[in-house]
Amino acid sequence: MALYEHVMIARQDLSNAQAEALNEHFGAVLADNGGTVVDTEYWGVKTMAYKINKNRKGHYSYLRTDAPSDAVQEMERLMRLHDDVMRVLTIKVDAHDEGPSVQMQKRDEREGRRERR
């Protein structure tokens, strides 16, 4: 099975619990089709650079999965049909990084940052 990373943006008018329930729902879809969810992260409500479907903000979620391509295609299809999901990005990776994603790390812990002037 292949390793994937997914980022999903849900509508801003959902509650935090509803946004996290979407992660569980799509994780169950993946599990029903022979895949597994390795890790999920809820990044919270963030402001977007431009409006999507008349929304300026959205609930961002991040999933790391290990699944066959058929399961990922079915999950993406259902995500795109779901009214609460605005955007989905799926990337196939060679290996999952250990620990939290860059978005979840504190600013001081990130590598490669230079001092501000």
UniProtKB/Swiss-Prot annotation:
Segments passing through the bilayer: none
Give me the ranges of the annotated region Disordered.
96-117
Keywords per UniProt: Ribonucleoprotein, Ribosomal protein, RNA-binding, rRNA-binding
Q: Name one GO biological process term.
A: translation
Q: Name one GO molecular function term.
A: structural constituent of ribosome
Tell me yes or no: is Phosphoprotein among this UniProt entry's keywords.
no
- At the top level, the lineage of the source is Bacteria
One Pfam family, short name: Ribosomal_S6
What InterPro entries is this protein classified in?
A: Ribosomal_bS6 (IPR000529), Ribosomal_bS6_sf (IPR035980), Ribosomal_S6_plastid/chlpt (IPR020814), Transl_elong_EF1B/ribsomal_bS6 (IPR014717)
Per the record, its GO cellular-component terms are: cytosolic small ribosomal subunit
What is the role of this chain?
A: Binds together with bS18 to 16S ribosomal RNA.
- Tell me its family: Belongs to the bacterial ribosomal protein bS6 family.
This protein's name: Small ribosomal subunit protein bS6
Q: Which gene encodes it?
A: rpsF
